[in-house]
Amino acid sequence: MNAPNIKRTLATDAYKIIKEKIIFCEYSPGQVLNLRALTQEIGFKSFTPVREALVSLRDEDLVKIVPRQGMFVSELSLNDVTDNYQIREIIEPTTLGITCPLITKETIRYYREKFEEIRKTEDSINYLEYLKLDMNFHMDLIRPLNNNNLGSILKNIYEQNTRYRMACFKKRLPEVMILEHIEILDTIEEKDSQRASIVLKKHIINSRNALISQKLGLN
């Protein structure tokens, strides 16, 4: 579901702050969201914008509102993980087959430098920063298509999946993930659309399997 189309207000600010804390697991799945505490933490004087933000996040399945019980961070579901990766496996390789010749040398160079840097400093990597880079990378692979609807769908999926990845890999980033990104860049640089699609599909499948294999109580 698309992010709410609302004006730049306190509710917008609260929405962005709380959403990032949920996505990057600062607020844990199942955690109670106390309206008063959230309002104080964000530094607002009124409950109203925070309440509006939580309703918007409920519409994105990030917050659960239970009458007479309260508000909670939505739980992680293994079915949601597999469903999201299935969508990615269907859409992303096909899209890259179209956009591959359109991805600029500057984009390739930028991400190659970033992933090579991560590869060299893997033990001290800031995993939160890596996930933001990874999300931007996959969004930039589809960006040349100039399809805003597709971009919104995939962005929502990336944000949902980031929660699972934070839960699974925040202690250590599997090296194979970095190597697969570099392999994707190699095929794009060669303008080999068919090979790029195959490599990306393999990467998505491997990422899904790695998440499931962690068995961190996501079901």
Regions inferred by a protein language model and the residue ranges of each:
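Short linear motifs at protein or domain termini
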Residues: M1-P101, S213-N219
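Hydrophobic alpha-helical segments typical of transmembrane helices
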Residues: I18, P49, D80, I91, ...
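Short loop-to-helix capping motifs
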Residues: L35, N147-N148, K191-D192
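Short helix-capping and inter-helix turn/linker motifs at the boundaries of alpha-helical repeat units
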Residues: T9, R109, R172-V176
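Short, charge-rich amphipathic alpha-helical segments embedded
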Residues: S152, I204-N219
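Short amphipathic alpha-helical interaction/hinge segments
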Residues: T162-R172, R208-K215
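Conserved amphipathic alpha-helical segments that form helical-bundle/coiled-coil interaction surfaces
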Residues: N84, L96, P101-M166, M177-D186, ...
